Amino acid sequence: MSTKWEKLEGNVGVLTIEVDAKEVNNSIDAAFKKVVKTINVPGFRKGKMPRPLFEQRFGIESLYQDALDIILPKAYGEAIEEAGIFPVDHPEIDIEKFEKNANLIFTAKVTVKPEVKLGEYKGLAVEKVETTVTDEDVENELKSLQERQAELVVKEEGTVENGDTAVIDFEGFVDGEAFEGGKGENYSLAIGSGTFIPGFEEQVIGLKSGESKDVEVSFPEEYHAAELAGKPATFKVTIHEIKTKELPELNDEFAKEADEAVATLDELKAKLRTNLEEGKKHEAEHKVRDEVVELAAANAEIEIPEAMINTELDRMVREFEQRLSQQGMNLELYYQFTGTDADKLKEQMKEDAQKRVRINLVLEAIIEAENIEVTEEEVTAEVEKMAEMYGMPVDAIKQALGSVDALAEDLKVRKAVDFLVENAA
């Protein structure tokens, strides 16, 4: 087999591949063995039709497509390996010659992984992140904990205030007509949560239990139900009950309720401070890692093929669909609620997809430039770490991974980012 690679404009090129006649004949033989099993001919058992009779009746050309299906993948795979190229999309195959007892000649037009011209990636200036935890930070965390431990109690007197929960009946009308989904009874509405249409909750503030009011609002222009989008509406609202948050007293008992591992409020505050310090340190480390990667990517010169962006977009949509399924939703419902579709979703994701592809290509180039490798021991250590994290046997982790090659590549990327951080200014 012979292979010739011709680079065209951009990231596109053409492989011209010639396969020996012997391989061609072998593929035709294999195609016959496959096809003859499906043919019933009087006088012969199924699959036992003689080759000469088959060729006389159907013509040898009837085997060519099946033969090509057999020979092309192998020939193309060997050709890209021989040419040392990395296609990022399906090839455009053009058969120039295919017949028995002759060499197969075909071309494959392919888009290949782009060349990355690295810019400055050592000594990158990154902003230092403040990790000091103040007394105010601790108090705010304590207040958040107190809020989470709060109980809702009925407000016997007074009116609805921001932060209260109003138990309401409501019915909405557009142009004097009730609409589907616009009615609810004994609905607990947290005031200030932004759950309802903009302007609704603010008009409930100041009402007393037992009071009714017509709330005038307009549906947002981008509202998911197209028949309501942008239209004014009137909601008839009745307040049944007002509930307010009753915060627990900050004392040792509260501390023990909040965290069984502490005995006093002071111990709880100390633990909160430690957690905040660890959180800020972790956040700072992530920020620095993200920043050096983005700077290195921005400094590089790359002409990214559209095929790579589309592949990444497909991956991102699959990831998004998985997250939706975990929330009991699917893409069709999401499109319905948001008034969007697959094309609009991909358009929203496109910038992030371009960024992901650029970063991946730059990190791969840095790995190559700095000869970054991972050892078998490092891969084994990572597998053991995963086993401990998930509470699974090491063999089960290996079986779940299938191959550790992808894990090894992930470790290389991690090392590349470590290198950028260690060499930052």
UniProtKB/Swiss-Prot annotation:
It holds the Pfam family Trigger_C. GO terms for cellular component: cytoplasm. It is found in: Cytoplasm. Signal peptide: none annotated. The keyword S-adenosyl-L-methionine does not apply. It catalyses: [protein]-peptidylproline (omega=180) = [protein]-peptidylproline (omega=0). GO terms for biological process: 'de novo' cotranslational protein folding; cell division; chaperone-mediated protein folding; protein transport; protein unfolding. The keyword Cytoplasm applies. InterPro entries: PPIase_dom_sf (IPR046357), PPIase_FKBP_dom (IPR001179), Trig_fac (IPR005215), Trigger_fac_C (IPR008880), Trigger_fac_C_sf (IPR037041), Trigger_fac_ribosome-bd_bac (IPR008881), Trigger_fac_ribosome-bd_sf (IPR036611), Trigger_fact/SurA_dom_sf (IPR027304). Keywords: Cell cycle, Cell division, Chaperone, Cytoplasm, Isomerase, Rotamase. Its EC number is 5.2.1.8. HAMAP family: Trigger_factor_Tig (MF_00303). Consists of 3 domains; the N-terminus binds the ribosome, the middle domain has PPIase activity, while the C-terminus has intrinsic chaperone activity on its own. This is Trigger factor. It comes from Bacillus cereus (strain ATCC 14579 / DSM 31 / CCUG 7414 / JCM 2152 / NBRC 15305 / NCIMB 9373 / NCTC 2599 / NRRL B-3711).
